[in-house]
């Protein structure tokens, strides 16, 4: 006879409070020597209203994670091209006239927003006519940054939560790969079809690498 206690099958209820205890893992990159993966684990604190992060390394070949205090010198800056000549960045660029005073210059005090499509707001971010664009520049002081998306009313990094994970150098330093949903107005609001684009820094040409994939392409 096998006697088993029902308590052995008891499981903790997955409550909102339990979810807050789970660590959020974020990969930071490969170490400069290529031997370790560097990542952080952020655990939210309801009482402190913030997340507390701990940093770790783990061998790429497998093994145990080791806690580290600083990661600044462990991971190469991914925004610097592999050949060291260029650096990537992003900034907002005004590409649309949304404010009433921009559309009607004679109404200098107008503070209304004028929209012609459904893309007036993305979650918690209003469309104010400015869009995130990717730039590159020579890796030296006071170098002029070049917009790889000139005059385009699209965002990369993606709004509202995209960051510098939305763009990266190709291994040969000749191209920039970036994530973007190149749709405008109501089409933008009704679609999640982001794509991966490749910008050639020599020819200035942009190629859609995932045109056949009608989905949320990010990697």
Predicted segments, located by residue:
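Conserved beta-propeller blade repeats
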Residues: 23-40, 70-90, 120-127, 133-134, ...
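Predominantly five- to eight-bladed beta-propeller fold
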Residues: 92-140, 145, 149-151, 179-182, ...
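Multi-bladed beta-propeller domains
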Residues: 10-24, 50, 58-74, 107-113, ...
